[in-house]
Amino acid sequence: MKKIVLAYSGGLDTSVILKWLQENYNCEVVVFTADIGQEDDMSVIQKKAAALNVKEIFIEDLKEEFVRDFVFPMFRANTIYEGYYLLGTSIARPLIAKRQIEIAHLTGADAVAHGATGKGNDQVRFEFGYYCCDPNIKVIAPWRQWELTSRHSLIEYARKNNINVPLDKVNEPPYSIDANLLHISYEGKSLEDPYVEPDYTMLSRSLTPELASSIPEYIEITFEQGDPIAINDISLSPANLLHQLNKIGGKHGIGIVDIVENRYIGIKSRGIYETPGGTILLHAHRAIESITLDRESAHLKDEIMPKYAKLIYNGYWWTTERKMLQSLIDKSQEKVNGTVRIKLYKGSVIVVGRKSNNSLYSYNLASFDSESQGYDHKDAEGFIKVNSLRLKKS
């Protein structure tokens, strides 16, 4: 191998991997860090890489691209995996993989490497992304190759090589954490027992509902063709809008979930997720769709959503079938315009109003107090008779 591009977070795992690659492949290692809203100090990450004698360091602000081209398209589908998971980690991997391959081409590297473990989904997501973008790229997955088979052995290797081991608030190695502008996830340690209540002091973006404000807050979100464009009539870029919703939702205890999910490779995994802004967006988007989509379009979207979510979760973002579904979803959003009013209170997102110039809602048809033109109550009798025929024969 001539040169390797490593997806580098600056954390314990990828710092150890960087050292291990240098020792075992005897070639130049380029590091790439995607700033997608994880709120790490990028200058510290650069110094860590430089201290390990890395000559080419790419640290790129991809927050706007991440939200505009990945998060928002996913939210047009009201995407949710297994009833709870808003796919915060899953949706970040295609962008990182794409840019990693682009940097490999730019620097003349013939291989890429990642820090995903051999038990997780991310190894699949990264490598599917690599091969979609460059079928001939060589892939190095250290967790499937080296003899460091546990967190303990990883920490020992780090200490022997003078690599800093971060500690949490109680002076222990922290949870396995993944963060971006959409969410923060926590795995490992005591969470591996699914019956143990989490220590919520781990949370960094949200207050728990018990500690959240006792005063409800009302906000309005404006949508244009299915994408949010403004909060309280203030237009914001995609990344800034999601960042602002995270701040608002976090102080009201919105979007904290405790999940046991089914990984693609067949293992069940427990995690704690903070997704305040995304949780608000999901409720708001469904609300604006409720008055702008006709019944059959809305029901069709609900039918295909689990398939779409599964494709993203399993790493198939760049595939033809995902793009086909995206085209259908995007077509449905052409008239999803308007404003949703929401009340936030102690972990709850309560839709209290919605309006749109494209609304299909008719007050005269819906009201119990008005006579509707074009609808006669007696018409329902024939409708019921025809649709009950098969029931009478069963």
Curated annotation (Swiss-Prot):
**Main localization, broad class:** cytoplasm
Residue positions binding ATP? A7, Y8, S9, G10, G11, L12, D13, T14, S15, A34, G115
Kindly state a single biological-process term from the GO annotations of this entry.
Answer: argininosuccinate metabolic process
Q: Where in the cell is it found?
A: Cytoplasm
Which amino acids does the record list as binding L-citrulline?
Y85, S90, N121, R125, S176, S185, E261, Y273
Catalytic activities: L-citrulline + L-aspartate + ATP = 2-(N(omega)-L-arginino)succinate + AMP + diphosphate + H(+)
Q: Which class of enzymes does this protein belong to?
A: ligase
Its Enzyme Commission number? 6.3.4.5
Give the highest taxon in the source lineage: Bacteria
Record-level Gene Ontology MF annotations: argininosuccinate synthase activity; ATP binding
| Pathway this chain belongs to | Amino-acid biosynthesis; L-arginine biosynthesis; L-arginine from L-ornithine and carbamoyl phosphate: step 2/3
GO CC term, one of those recorded: cytoplasm
Per UniProt, L-aspartate binds at T117, N121, D122
Which keywords fit this entry according to its UniProt record? Amino-acid biosynthesis, Arginine biosynthesis, ATP-binding, Cytoplasm, Ligase, Nucleotide-binding
Stored InterPro entries? Arginosuc_syn_C, Arginosuc_syn_N, Arginosuc_synth, Arginosuc_synth_CS, Arginosuc_synth_type_1_subfam, AS_cat/multimer_dom_body, Rossmann-like_a/b/a_fold
Subunit? Homotetramer.
Q: Which HAMAP family match?
A: Arg_succ_synth_type1 (MF_00005)
Q: Which family does it belong to?
A: Belongs to the argininosuccinate synthase family. Type 1 subfamily.
Name this polypeptide is given: Argininosuccinate synthase
